[in-house]
Regions:
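Jelly-roll (double-stranded beta-helix
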Residues: 1-452
């Protein structure tokens, strides 16, 4: 029986020939793209001979038999297969990178914690050199929890590449632009944007603005558990919050460098190094739904109270990673964006709270309304489960007495990594000079006002 002839149709999005950045829209879509016309096979994943002499290779992000709605995989068509990347690994020091379980490094007593911004480096420092862990939770061996990192850098990753088998990376730039060059292509992100890099995908981070742009700084959540996805909207309906159309996935881009380079692999909390004779970012075409993406947080459409009371912060959830308990996240990524406050006869800042979840917060820019002093851009706070927190004394006094009129919170963007698991500060975080030991004093002036 003769082979069935297939129509010569390709669904691939062709990258710009001039190397300009381009992206495809949607969240969790099955994308198809090629950097060279004809590089993506038509109607087959693994033809007997892949086009242009490329190798076909699959990266699985889930078990083969995972339900269709959660099944993740991507097909690469690359110059050399990844089996050439995995030889001669040797373990190297982890530096300031830590992985859960990591419970015994800190001797800090329980309490509300806050740090001033991580200092920017003077010595040459790339993203991997400047990555350091502030807190961890869960257990990478059972694939639950996450690590909260910060990064600082003043140079690009020159002939240096990174891959983590422990979790997906959620990158949150706070100062300066970064270019994330993955096996799928290139994404540039500035403060106010985020990037997700899938687990097991090789990438490097460059500074597209060079020395003129100055050093960069930001936050990272390394998610060990179920992958981040868009939260259910429930009674909100079909619109608002983060809309899938606003997520951008890169079109194919590749490096064809025949020069020695370094690949660092993170696995089971350890770092391993190997030397390659060529760049591992040599994917000329790809298709699938396990791909990196970026999102502009300013496109988040917030909802809120239009009459009275401050709603729960969960209404500002951008992304969520489920745990085994419905509605109780392994990791939520929540933002506090620009918005209107119109509630009548109500205390408008976030209220005083003891949360069964643990909260790691950062400020990307502007002023956070519950902490107008002391919590500055680049800073961080950690409120573990059931530790009380809330507006400082000055914020309480102002919000309790001001004349209420419609008010726009402008020029502000804070975020929160929230988890069901207790967050353990690392030894590095516990010993930093930037640890604000006076933080609990911000509530000291809250006076007794009870009268009968």
């Amino acid at each position: 029986m003769d082979a069935v002839e297939l129509p010569a149709f390709s669904e691939a999005v062709l990258s710009p020939a001039n190397g300009a950045l381009a992206a495809m829209t949607g969240f969790g879509n099955s994308f198809a793209t090629e950097a060279v016309r004809g590089a993506l096979p038509v109607a087959r994943n693994s033809p007997q001979q892949a086009p242009l002499g490329l190798y076909a290779e699959q990266l699985s992000g889930s078990a083969f038999t995972a339900p269709r709605q959660s099944n993740k995989r991507i097909w690469f068509y690359r110059i050399r297969p990844s089996v050439l990347h995995g030889r001669n690994f040797r373990e190297i020091e982890c530096g300031l990178i830590r992985t859960a379980p990591c419970r015994d490094e800190s001797s800090l007593p329980i309490g509300q914690l806050r740090w001033q911004p991580t200092p920017l480096p003077d010595a040459p420092t790339d993203f991997l050199d400047g990555l350091r862990t502030m807190a961890t939770c869960g257990d990478v061996f059972t694939q639950v929890g996450f690590a909260s990192h910060v990064y600082v850098a003043n140079r690009s990753m020159d002939r240096r590449y990174f891959c983590t088998a422990d979790g997906e990376f959620l990158l949150v730039p706070q100062q300066g632009r970064i270019e994330v060059f993955t096996e799928c292509g290139r994404l540039v992100a500035a403060p106010g944007e985020i990037v997700i890099v899938p687990k097991g995908m090789k990438f490097k981070i460059d500074l597209p603005d060079g020395q003129a742009g100055g050093p960069v700084r930001g936050y990272v959540a390394e998610n060990y558990g179920h992958y981040l996805t868009l939260p259910e909207r429930g009674p909100i309906g079909a619109n608002c919050l983060a809309n899938a159309r606003d997520f951008l996935t890169p079109t194919a881009a590749y490096e064809d460098h025949e020069a020695a380079c370094e690949l660092i692999m993170k696995s089971q909390g350890r770092l391993y190094h190997t030397t390659l004779p060529h760049s591992p970012l040599d994917v000329v075409a790809w298709h699938g739904n396990f791909a990196p993406c970026k999102y502009d947080l300013r496109r988040f459409s917030p909802v809120g109270s239009v009459m009275f009371d401050h709603p729960d912060p969960s209404i500002y959830t951008v992304l969520t990673a489920a745990s085994d308990t419905p509605g109780t996240a392994n990791l939520d990524f929540v933002i506090f964006p620009e918005r209107w406050l119109v509630m009548e006869n109500s205390f408008r800042p976030p209220w005083y709270h003891m949360n069964v979840m643990s909260e790691f917060m950062g400020l990307i820019y502007g002023v956070y309304d519950a902490k107008p002093g002391g919590f500055v851009p680049g800073g961080m706070s950690l409120h573990n489960a059931l530790l009380p927190h809330g507006p400082d004394a000055d914020a309480f006094a102002k919000a309790s007495t001001k004349t209420l009129a419609p008010e726009r919170l402008s020029g502000t963007l804070a975020f929160m990594f929230e988890t069901r698991y207790p967050l353990c500060p690392t030894g590095y975080a516990s010993e930093l000079d930037t640890l604000d030991t006076m933080y609990p004093d911000c509530w000291e002036k809250l006076e007794r006002k009870f009268k009968v």
